Amino acid sequence: MTEGVGLPLWLLAELTYRCPLQCPYCSNPLDYAQHKNELTTQEWFDVFDQARQMGAVQLGFSGGEPLVRQDLEQLVAHAHQLGFYTNLITSGMGLTEQRISHLKQAGLDHIQISFQASDPVVNDALAGSKHAFEQKYEMCRLVKKYDYPMVLNFVIHRHNIDQIDKIIELCLELNADTVELAICQFYGWAFLNRQGLLPTQEQLIRAERITNEYREKLKAQNHPCKLIFVVPDYYEERPKACMNGWGKIFFTVAPDGMALPCHAARQLPISFPNVREQSLSRIWYESTGFNHFRGDAWMPEGCRSCPDKDRDFGGCRCQAYMLTGNASNADPVCGKSPYHQFIEQARAESEIDSSLEKLVFRNSRNSKQFTVQQNIPVQNIVDD
């Protein structure tokens, strides 16, 4: 099937599921500890070569923590030689001035650093790692020193949303060019911890108001910092155009070579191919996994006849699966969906107090307690 299928313009290389942090909102699979057979340097080179030949122009290095890979500089250099625009999506852990210098020499175009909170104690508690805030702060200084645009990402949830003003002040202190204030998206570990992470509607309204006030102040000062506020699906009435449509632009390769239309799709009961076994071209154009939700033939009648289907492409398939057990169902976020009550229930649950200590942290010991059939941890463990 090639007719009407666009080019895979954006390649996400999930280099590893390994990570020194333990964020309870990580979007990696719950059972990530089972997937250890990472692609080699040469195998990634081959993936980049094929993707570029197919028309891919942007390449994101993600994880886990991509800096865990000691061949990252080699991968960046190869991608740069091919003509990719390259973006490193990192926690900053494992970054040093020497590595930034080497990445700059290799041709890396862009670095995005994530924080957990503006307060060092809360930041390190959410990260499950001592001195994480200190490391991130110092790396932001070095990113500026090496003339990279300062792009910061904060995942916003009920445990840090009330400090949104302090978060923005920290970003201004670090001379950020772009700040993404992204309300938690509930996939992977975040979905497991949803009740303890989803902000209340009152919290959300206040945070958006404060963000808009800062935008006005910055505009009046002709300040270059751009604030991006990403509202969670759970407080919308229409679904997002997830990944700009299934298999339309985005091509994700997981650490073990599994090819996915989006990084969350691994959980779906669909057979996805592996780049070790099939060419990227065959995967993109011919595989069942990438063609499964293309077009509108798969849509239930209410979605297929909806005038918004060409805008939202039916919403998020992973969200439909997580909330209803069937990836073909109408996205529950949609107010027209017969499953919208699941979203309303989640909103109601957000009003229940939940402490930071109740969150299940993302680490190998917790991951090993999960299976594909039963995603329930036996006990929560925070690694020292």
Curated annotation (Swiss-Prot):
Cofactor note: Binds 1 [4Fe-4S] cluster. The cluster is coordinated with 3 cysteines and an exchangeable S-adenosyl-L-methionine.
Superkingdom per UniProt: Bacteria
UniProt cross-references to InterPro entries, sorted A to Z: 4Fe4S-binding_SPASM_dom, Aldolase_TIM, Elp3/MiaA/NifB-like_rSAM, MoaA_NifB_PqqE_Fe-S-bd_CS, PQQ_synth_PqqE_bac, PqqE-like, Radical_SAM_PqqE_MftC-like, rSAM
Entry binding sites for [4Fe-4S] cluster: C19, C23, C26
SMART domains associated with the record: Elp3
Positions of the Radical SAM core domain: 5-220
A molecular function (GO) term: S-adenosyl-L-methionine binding
Catalyzed reactions: [PQQ precursor protein] + S-adenosyl-L-methionine = E-Y cross-linked-[PQQ precursor protein] + 5'-deoxyadenosine + L-methionine + H(+)
Required cofactor(s): [4Fe-4S] cluster
Pathway involvement of the protein, from the record: Cofactor biosynthesis; pyrroloquinoline quinone biosynthesis
UniProt cross-references to SUPFAM superfamilies, sorted A to Z: Radical SAM enzymes
HAMAP family documented for this protein: PqqE (MF_00660)
Family: Belongs to the radical SAM superfamily. PqqE family.
Oligomeric and partner information: Interacts with PqqD. The interaction is necessary for activity of PqqE.
Name recorded for this polypeptide: PqqA peptide cyclase
Native organism: Acinetobacter baumannii (strain AYE)
